[in-house]
Amino acid sequence: MSLMVVSMACVGFFLLQGAWPHEGVHRKPSLLAHPGPLVKSEETVILQCWSDVRFEHFLLHREGKYKDTLHLIGEHHDGVSKANFSIGPMMQDLAGTYRCYGSVTHSPYQLSAPSDPLDIVITGLYEKPSLSAQPGPTVLAGESVTLSCSSRSSYDMYHLSREGEAHERRFSAGPKVNGTFQADFPLGPATHGGTYRCFGSFRDSPYEWSNSSDPLLVSVTGNPSNSWPSPTEPSSKTGNPRHLHVLIGTSVVKIPFTILLFFLLHRWCSNKKNAAVMDQEPAGNRTVNSEDSDEQDHQEVSYA
């Protein structure tokens, strides 16, 4: 038996005892599920652990299940080291939260930091729920839409997934109404369509889900750029260009009108000021001015 096999066997012994070797020496690897983390009963999923660090060995384990720890020799291609762990046929015992680690040959007891957790869920165990859209599966851009997942089965939790997205949304089921349990998923103002499915699960087995609902295609009509702006975005980003032209035209008209109004107001104030000064002059001065005016008029008559 080679030294490496013995070393990895020792690592496995530590895992069985619930004690990890020294970890966090290297950067954490990444853990992905192919084709995805939702796996139908009896199907197989590939968990790929990879890193740009040249790891010779990868370890995969399920949280709380040290006996399920797996070891693979890493493959190296184009500066990336990876290992593909085949999990299946999928059963309830294989569902759960997984993490992976990397290690190098010369220090097998020094593991990398753990990858981010990855939840593997088994589906297809119970009756499928129903999925509907309010006000309907076809909505205008910017219109609010709510998806409702319901079933006669007493599921504690409902899960909504969108095709092409890894993460799902979950809501607790509401009280029983008209013989059904339901959860509503508000999606907010619609911008892009997509295909949605929902699942049901029970509180004591969160990794075991029902069959998928029938797929629901949500279509968005109209130009998304004309949809309602979000509260954090200025309306000019999503507003109508024609409305912008009207604003510009109104501004062009207002500018000269404001200048003219200011000019007239200035003239009016000046006249008021001159009139006030005339009213405050002494009476004698006004008499002299009147006499001077008469003399000027007389002179003009004499010359005529």
UniProtKB/Swiss-Prot annotation:
It is found in: Cell membrane. Residues 220-239, 280-304 are annotated as: Disordered. SUPFAM superfamilies: Immunoglobulin. One of its GO terms (cellular component) is membrane. Residues 42-107, 142-205 form the Ig-like C2-type domain. Residues 22-245 are extracellular. The chain crosses the membrane at residues 246-265. GO terms for biological process: immune response; immune response-regulating signaling pathway; stimulatory killer cell immunoglobulin-like receptor signaling pathway. Residues 266-304 are cytoplasmic. Keywords: Cell membrane, Disulfide bond, Glycoprotein, Immunoglobulin domain, Membrane, Receptor, Repeat, Signal, Transmembrane, Transmembrane helix. Residues 1-21 form the signal peptide. Pfam families: ig (PF00047). Belongs to the immunoglobulin superfamily. This is Killer cell immunoglobulin-like receptor 2DS2. The gene is KIR2DS2.
